[in-house]
């Protein structure tokens, strides 16, 4: 009976000592949190291993994350994963669609995003671009003749329009001279002509008798204007003038119309400020609706694909610039010892408990072996 009691005692003591030793060793990883002094003498094994080596642990965790967890190869593999790409594209399409179907005005959305003075800046920049384009256009075209400056189609239209212009001028001339106003103007012209030639007027009066000169001249003028030969003559004159104009420099226009006047006229016609204001008062949905399908089905997938491709090609550079090791090191260094202990225990609680039980098991086995040795040595 004493033999079995001794074996049980040695086994139990071995298990208790082994289990408690491992439990104490685990506790000494974290406790005490701070060094303990007796006078000026620091008690050995204080503070615990992890509090003592916290800074080194932070450095090693940073290296571990960069070298073994968030590696360029691993991230690159994830970015090129087809399922990941499909999911990202779908997410982007949903988010972009929420934005472009928003019924709030562009003005409100920009103000919400703290983008100030949009209307003034947009108006100023558009007017600046238009002004620069006009100046560049004029600077180039002022070196040309009208024949070089105008497109071939314009040349054809003008040349085809000359006969019609001649007919129009003659028709208006006939209408004018048939009117009372035209007759009065013609009469004045005749009177002015003969006023400087007094004897000639008396001679003409002898031939015409009681009939006024204007009554004789008016029908002849109208007849002259209505003749085909007159039309052809006027057409030839206009054609010659057109040929002369084609050979003249566009720069001559500057003598009649200043550049700034042209710019001012264009800006006034375009009404940039009014146009920008109307545009900003539209809802995001109104602006984007015509191109919504294109944005969702083409632009977003293309942009995501290009972004992923760029990210894959530059992932190493991105990670280097992020300095992940330093970030992890700084974060771990800011942890209190208590928080660090809770963090480690939350991950390894079961494993550490099993280590304690293993210590008890080994201690018990050693105690049992000791009991058996004592039994055989008697």
From Swiss-Prot:
Subcellular localization, as worded in the UniProt entry: Cell membrane
Principal place of residence: membrane
GO cellular component: a single term: plasma membrane
Residue ranges crossing the lipid bilayer per the database entry: 357-377
UniProt keyword list: Cell membrane, Membrane, Transmembrane, Transmembrane helix
Membrane topology: Single-pass membrane protein
Domain of life: Bacteria
Keyword Transmembrane helix: yes
Family: Belongs to the UPF0754 family.
Protein name per its UniProtKB record: UPF0754 membrane protein BCB4264_A0915
Native organism: Bacillus cereus (strain B4264)
């Amino acid at each position: 009976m004493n033999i079995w009691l001794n074996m049980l005692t040695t086994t139990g003591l071995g298990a208790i000592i082994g289990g408690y030793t491992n439990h104490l060793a685990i506790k000494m990883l974290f406790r005490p949190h701070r060094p303990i002094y007796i006078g000026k003498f620091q008690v050995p094994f204080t503070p615990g291993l992890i509090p003592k080596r916290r800074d080194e642990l932070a450095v090693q965790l940073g290296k571990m994350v960069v070298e073994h967890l968030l590696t360029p190869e691993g991230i690159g593999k994830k970015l090129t994963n087809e399922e990941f790409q499909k999911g990202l594209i779908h997410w982007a399409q949903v988010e972009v669609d929420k934005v472009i179907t928003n019924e709030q005005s562009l003005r409100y959305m920009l103000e919400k995003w703290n983008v100030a003075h949009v209307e003034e800046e947009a108006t100023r920049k558009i007017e600046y671009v238009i002004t620069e384009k006009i100046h560049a256009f004029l600077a180039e075209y002022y070196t040309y003749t009208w024949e070089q400056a105008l497109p071939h189609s314009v040349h054809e239209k003008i040349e085809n329009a000359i006969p019609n212009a001649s007919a129009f001028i003659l028709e208006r001339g006939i209408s004018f001279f048939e009117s009372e106003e035209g007759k009065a103007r013609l009469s004045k012209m005749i009177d002015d002509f003969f006023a400087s030639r007094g004897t000639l007027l008396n001679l003409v009066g002898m031939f015409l008798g009681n009939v006024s000169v204007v009554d004789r001249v008016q029908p002849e003028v109208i007849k002259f204007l209505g003749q085909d030969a007159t039309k052809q003559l006027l057409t030839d004159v206009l054609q010659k003038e057109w040929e002369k104009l084609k050979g003249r420099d566009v720069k001559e226009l500057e003598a009649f119309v200043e550049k700034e006047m042209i710019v001012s006229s264009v800006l006034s016609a375009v009404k940039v400020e009014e146009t920008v204001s109307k545009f900003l008062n539209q809802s995001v949905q109104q602006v984007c609706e015509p191109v919504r399908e294109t944005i969702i089905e083409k632009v977003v997938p293309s942009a995501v694909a290009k972004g992923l491709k760029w990210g894959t090609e530059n992932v190493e550079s991105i990670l280097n610039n992020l300095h992940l090791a330093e970030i992890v090191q700084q974060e771990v260094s800011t942890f209190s010892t208590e928080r660090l202990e809770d963090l480690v225990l939350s991950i390894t609680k079961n494993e550490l408990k099993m280590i304690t039980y293993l210590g008890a098991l080994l201690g018990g086995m050693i105690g049992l072996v000791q009991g058996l040795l004592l039994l055989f040595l008697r």
